[in-house]
Every structure is written in C-alpha cells, then in structure tokens.
Amino acid sequence: MLPKLNGFDHIHIDVLNRKKAAEWYKNILGFTIVESLTVWAEDDNGPLTIQDPFGKIHLALFRQRGNFTPLTAIAFNADGREFLKWKDWLKKQNILLRCSDHKVAWSIYFKDLYGNSHEITTYEYDYVSSQLK
C-alpha cells in the first residue's frame, strides 16, 4: 500500500525580483508573504513564500539568475508519519535524491523518469526530527 499524500505543498516560480513579484501577486491575486517562512528568503538562493488569502496555495518565489533555465518542481505535502513512509518508499525505489532539514520543515527530493523534479514536504518538524535521529 502506498503512503498517503495530503496535496500540493507549494509551486516553485523563478522571478527576477522576489519583492516586486510578491507585490504583484498581492495586488492581483491577494497573496501575502508567509511570515513564518521568511527565514528562507534571507538567503539569496532561498524562496520568498507567499500564500493565497485562505492559506491553501503557496508559491515559492526564487530569484532567477542569468541565463538559468527556470526550475520547475512540484512539492507535495504529507504529515510527519506519511513523510517518513514516503522517504522509505522512495529509497526502496532507488530514486530518493536527498532528505533536507529546512529548520522549520523537512523535505525529500526525487525525479521522475524524464528528470522532472518533485518534493514532499512536512511541517511536522519536531516529530520527523525525533524519528530521524
């Protein structure tokens, strides 16, 4: 039996200026900056995460650099227990690329057969941290 996914977590979008993009999404779609995740935006390579008014849709705004081809990735969400099951499942399938501690969340990364990037993220940080030690 496959582990359960809760839904999409966030969509990566490359932009030239994260602040200007966040303002545009606010003005056009009502998205606001997710204050609890702004620590990631302190790093030039990290995302500025914004969300819709209901907190259901998250966009991770990444700064596009030079001739870089924009990154497209789908990030799914799972609770802590299911996240660990997915980690084991992907490892068994030999497609788990890495498991990353983001200090407020955990993510696992893998690619499909065509090289498209995928991620599963959980915000049950304390639970997963305790299980991975």
Role assignments for model-derived ranges:
Residues 58-62, 119:
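Conserved beta-strand in the GNAT
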Residues 1-4, 8-16, 48-53, 64-133, ...:
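Vicinal oxygen chelate
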Residues 1-20, 73-74, 128-133:
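N-terminal beta-strand motif that seeds the catalytic metal site of vicinal oxygen chelate
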